[in-house]
Amino acid sequence: MTDAPRSPDALSPDRVTTAFDLPGHTTVRALGVAQGIVVRSRSIVGTFGASLQTLFGGNITLYTSLCEKARQHAFDKMLDDARRLGANAVVAMRYDSTEIGSGVTEVICYGTAVQVAPDAGR
């Protein structure tokens, strides 16, 4: 199965920005907040392995990998939500995370879902 070709106007990761405007485009309509929320827990094995890494200092690769995967999953869910709202871009994108229990972390990715049009002359 092949993916259908995307419209040049379709929402893709390159149309997501932390800025309040998408460069080279004018915001035509704000559609509301798009968000993706992921709740992850650490396994007993992962927690033990990470505890061993803390003895030696430096980057705790097990937690780094878990955080990267959680952020990417939250980002993907935010894109899905923005598409559902009819957006072709997301501006003012942010991440936040909170530990909601022992070893349980919530990661949220959110931004303003918008419809944009290329600036005149583009």
From Swiss-Prot:
Top-rank lineage group of the source organism: Bacteria
Short name of one Pfam family: YbjQ_1
SUPFAM superfamilies found in the cross-reference section: YbjQ-like (SSF117782)
PANTHER family, per the entry: UPF0145 PROTEIN SCO3412, UPF0145 PROTEIN YBJQ
Family as reported in the entry's similarity comment: Belongs to the UPF0145 family.
Protein name: UPF0145 protein Bmul_3577/BMULJ_04940
Organism: Burkholderia multivorans (strain ATCC 17616 / 249)
